[in-house]
């Protein structure tokens, strides 16, 4: 399996990193774009969040198409179209065009993350899926950090060739998605039997290992699993987690700017929580695997996030507030690694695609609700204290729902 991991996971991690850059770069653009096109905090929040509404609407259809046409073609299509639309964000001139482009971008990206999660089930036996998921999810906080380091310098191109700096930012940061989409189209393979870098006996063994658990469930049992109350709880856990995550991440540059930092300082300071989270999430996942335990790690991660956001809101604009946000970020990303390692998504065929997409799509509604709540509760467009308290409440609610899930013995094991 080491050969499979080294062949697939670096590319998947890079794809996911670029995806996360694309999702958060609008928060850095907002430092100057909001003024240039006349957006207040509430209007920006609506535009930043509407991305997730279209993501939600198109996610399940996108994942079902992926199951039919294959990962190579469909993931490449997703990356190329989101790259084109992300670059087109440079053309927005006001609230209406900003909303339209953000909606189209969400529709283009729909199915990407659950598609990768589903792809893992095509290549990795059950005993390897948790670590495989953790390894490529590690790139999520790094994508946020890289976005800050790249975006703010690009904002300084203001006036070059008659364009605003944020316009250059959107154009430049669309290129990696376009290029990677072409790479995926050329090198990614859908199933083990299609590759030449595995020996014949290795291909046959791997196909047996990944197909056995898929065939162990009847279609009726699979659909029943998707619709039961435990699946609903998973969706709500991910929803409330994402409300806290995106409510903070899509406003972090504005929060830091409101604390008196220059744009250059914001670009550096905004990377700190995400670099910290990347390291912390790896340690958290390692400890979870060491203990062979998931639920308490998920609960503890969300309680840590709730505490960090509460302390940050209480402290206001200070260095210690950034430290508290960093603690919260560790919990938010650690939760995701453990959450996606739970086994109920290991179904087969179209049911597997629908199950993964349904939980992720419902969860991604939090990407709309969280930022919108933070935006409309901002006092004077610069004081986000109320929003941080509310996001802390979302994290605490996610922990409570996770405890209920554990009591229901969702995984029926010591996971």
Q: What spans do the regions from the language model cover?
A:
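Extracytoplasmic
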Residues: 7-41, 147, 248-253, 370
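Extracytoplasmic gate region of multi-pass secondary transporters
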Residues: 26-27, 226-281, 336, 340
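Helix-breaking motifs and short loop linkers at transmembrane-helix boundaries and internal kinks
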Residues: 38, 70, 91-97, 108, ...
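Conserved MFS/SLC helix-loop-helix module at the cytosolic interface between two early adjacent transmembrane helices
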Residues: 57-96
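Glycine-rich segments within core transmembrane alpha-helices of 12-TM secondary carriers
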Residues: 131-152, 176-177, 360-370
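C-terminal transmembrane helical hairpin of 12-TM major facilitator-type secondary transporters
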Residues: 292-342
């Amino acid at each position: 399996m080491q050969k499979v991991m080294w062949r697939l996971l670096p590319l998947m991690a890079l794809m996911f990193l670029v995806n996360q850059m694309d999702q958060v770069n609008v928060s850095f653009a907002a430092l100057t774009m909001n003024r240039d096109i006349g957006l207040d905090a509430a209007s920006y929040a609506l535009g930043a969040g509407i991305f997730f509404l279209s993501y939600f609407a198109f996610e399940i259809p996108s994942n079902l198409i992926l199951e039919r046409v294959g990962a190579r073609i469909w993931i490449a299509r997703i990356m190329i179209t989101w790259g084109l639309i992300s670059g087109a964000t440079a053309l927005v001139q006001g609230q209406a065009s900003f909303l339209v482009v953000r909606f189209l971008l969400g529709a283009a990206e729909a199915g990407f993350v659950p598609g990768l999660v589903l792809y893992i089930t095509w290549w990795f036996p059950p005993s390897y899926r948790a670590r495989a998921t953790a390894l490529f999810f590690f790139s999520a906080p790094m994508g946020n950090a890289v976005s800050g380091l790249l975006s703010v310098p690009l904002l300084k191109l203001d006036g070059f060739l008659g364009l605003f700096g944020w316009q250059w930012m959107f154009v430049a940061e669309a290129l990696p998605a376009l290029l990677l989409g072409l790479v995926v189209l050329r090198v990614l393979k859908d199933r083990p039997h299609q590759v030449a870098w595995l020996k014949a006996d290795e291909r046959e063994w791997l196909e047996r290992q990944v197909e056995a658990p898929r065939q162990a469930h009847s279609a009726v049992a699979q659909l029943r699993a998707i619709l039961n109350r435990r699946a609903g709880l998973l969706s709500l856990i991910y929803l409330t987690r994402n409300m806290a995550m995106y409510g903070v991440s899509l406003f972090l540059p504005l929060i830091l700017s409101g604390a008196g930092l220059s744009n250059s300082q914001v670009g550096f300071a905004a990377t700190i929580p995400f670099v910290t989270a990347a390291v912390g999430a790896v340690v958290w996942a390692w400890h979870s695997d060491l203990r062979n335990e998931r639920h308490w790690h998920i609960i503890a991660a969300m309680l840590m996030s709730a505490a960090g956001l509460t302390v940050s809101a209480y402290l206001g604009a200070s260095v210690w507030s950034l430290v508290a946000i960093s603690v919260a970020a560790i919990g938010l990303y650690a939760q995701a690694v453990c959450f996606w390692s739970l086994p109920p998504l290991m179904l087969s065929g179209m049911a597997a695609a629908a199950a993964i997409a349904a939980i992720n799509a419902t969860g991604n509604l939090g990407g709309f609700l969280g930022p919108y709540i933070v935006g409309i509760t901002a006092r004077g467009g610069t004081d986000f204290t109320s929003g941080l308290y509310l996001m802390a409440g979302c994290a605490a609610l996610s922990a409570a729902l996770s405890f209920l899930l554990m009591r229901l013995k969702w995984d029926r094991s010591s996971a």
